[in-house]
Regions:
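Short, contiguous acidic/charged loop-to-helix segments that flank catalytic cores in large enzymes
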Residues: 82-89, 130-138
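Conserved alpha/beta catalytic core and glycan-binding cleft of carbohydrate-active enzymes
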Residues: 1-122, 152-177
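Aromatic- and carboxylate-lined catalytic core of secreted/periplasmic carbohydrate-active enzymes
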Residues: 131-166
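Active-site His/acidic residue clusters
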Residues: 121-130
């Protein structure tokens, strides 16, 4: 985890880099979680929060991380960051995870996020596995399974995700559609 703009974290040592394989994309994580917290009505005015990371996505070899740091210390679980009630919260979470899978960079979800753990994570207790008896949590788990299977099957989603050649904007500024 490196949270500054230190250059060449994943650059070759021979070229002055640090030689790490991947760097956590902290900027993407912050913008993504803040955007997803917004009521959908207000998202169009904050569209840049979802597109800005692509302006630097290939400056390092990034991994998109929704880590334990985002679901502890009164920051809420991912599902409880979502606006709305009931169905809307789960629909927002599904949309967010789909966006993440389509974004350049490797992916990492922290435990419990794949079935919408309700409580914040704590090292003092296990995950709330009983939630998988509830249809909405089963649906999130199935959604994640299907997204991951699609990601694995569709090489275009990962094959060139560390190169500009693997991405093309259709319209980065179409916030009002």
């Amino acid at each position: 985890e490196e949270s500054t703009a230190w250059p060449k974290v994943t650059g070759d040592v021979e070229d002055g880099g640090l030689g790490f394989s991947l760097k956590w994309n902290m900027g993407w994580m912050h913008d993504f979680t803040e955007y997803m917290k917004l009521d959908p009505y207000f998202r169009k005015d904050n569209h840049h929060m979802m597109t800005f990371a692509m302006s630097y996505a290939y400056s390092e070899d990034y991994i998109l991380v929704l880590s334990h740091d985002e679901v502890v210390h009164l920051k809420c679980s991912m599902i409880n960051k979502m606006p709305g009630l009931g169905f809307d919260k789960y629909a927002n979470l599904k949309a967010g995870y789909a966006f993440m899978m389509g974004h350049a960079g490797k992916k990492l979800l922290f435990m419990g996020q794949d079935f919408a753990q309700l409580r914040e994570w704590s090292e003092e207790r296990e995950l709330d596995w009983y939630l998988l008896e509830e249809p909405e949590h089963q649906a999130i788990q199935s959604w994640m399974r299907d997204l991951l299977h699609m990601y694995k099957k569709k090489q275009a989603l990962y094959e060139l995700d560390q190169s500009w050649e693997g991405f093309e904007w259709v319209n980065a500024d179409d916030a009002y559609r």
